[in-house]
Amino acid sequence: MKEGGLRNKVAVIGSGSWGTAIANLLCKAGNETILWGRDENVIDEINNARVNSKYLPGVELFLRATCDLDYAVADASHVYIALPSFALSKVLPKLSLDKFSIVISLIKCLEPDTGRRMSEVISEALDLGHNRLAVISGPNLALEVANDEPSVSVVASANIATANIVAGTLKCPGFYCIPSSDIKGVEICAASKNLVALISGIARGMDLGDNTRAALITLGFRELLRLVLENGGTEETVFGVAGLGDVVATCNSHLSRNNKAGVLLAKGAPLDEVKQTAEGVVAISGVLALAERSGVYMPIAQALSQVISGKRTAHSLLDICFSLA
């Protein structure tokens, strides 16, 4: 634990792998941290056994947990949202925040069908100004962060002062934060990289070689770049840890759920099983909605959507990709 006493009361909403990992990190950084979740068994295990065996097995936890949402956010100066996107509409209206609380999104997707960024969804639901919103993204596989593997993340807010404040709460050995004002670019990278990872996983599931996978990742990354730049993001973000860095980690790690989902798609697994594996499968509609709204041509993403819906085979997806090379 960090010496020098507690610095902030921090709440993390969502007791899955990433929510638990970031809550434990915040606790190590010297913050008074409380984790909220719906599953009473998970919460009881965290409080009594100091582990979350369902989502983050083998990691010792130093935090408190609760199923009481009001208790979790009471007097919290920072509130981290680590929920699946589909759960936001149920949970956000129940949040009663301090008027100065900063809300930080850990969600790496766009709203399905609308393409809105998660910070936009949260801002509207909670009536928050830009100076009270931030996002965190980067190559941050939850288990590696929880095991204190050195990691770098981007903390982005339209207000750079807010990004710096949030980065300060996360400061601890082995976890490095880069403040950024490019919140649009960071969020779009986070969502779009899921598609690149799915394509990489499909190639892996088809037992294709590294040459093929590298080409597919590059072509998918090219679409990500166009989408980010057309929507006001920067090249610095795309080629930094929130863009390229996250793509590298997600496409190559056995811990990546989107990578695993791509493997399942290639092997013809039922769609329900694929959806349960990774939110990126569901959220592809958000990326395509944003692309349509901003006039960005994304043929690979469109073909991937057809593979997911069963209208196209994985082999035909490869044909489309290589026709664009």
Curated annotation (Swiss-Prot):
Active-site residues annotated for this sequence: 193 (proton acceptor)
Binding residue positions for sn-glycerol 3-phosphate: 108, 138, 193, 246, 256-258
UniProt GO cellular component terms: cytosol
Secretion signal span: none
This protein's pathway: Membrane lipid metabolism; glycerophospholipid metabolism
Superkingdom classification of source: Bacteria
Keyword line: Cytoplasm, Lipid biosynthesis, Lipid metabolism, NAD, NADP, Nucleotide-binding, Oxidoreductase, Phospholipid biosynthesis, Phospholipid metabolism
Molecular-function GO term, any one: glycerol-3-phosphate dehydrogenase [NAD(P)+] activity
E.C. number: 1.1.1.94
Stated family: Belongs to the NAD-dependent glycerol-3-phosphate dehydrogenase family.
HAMAP family membership: NAD_Glyc3P_dehydrog
Protein name, UniProt field: Glycerol-3-phosphate dehydrogenase [NAD(P)+]
Organism: Tropheryma whipplei (strain TW08/27) (Whipple's bacillus)
Gene encoding the protein: gpsA
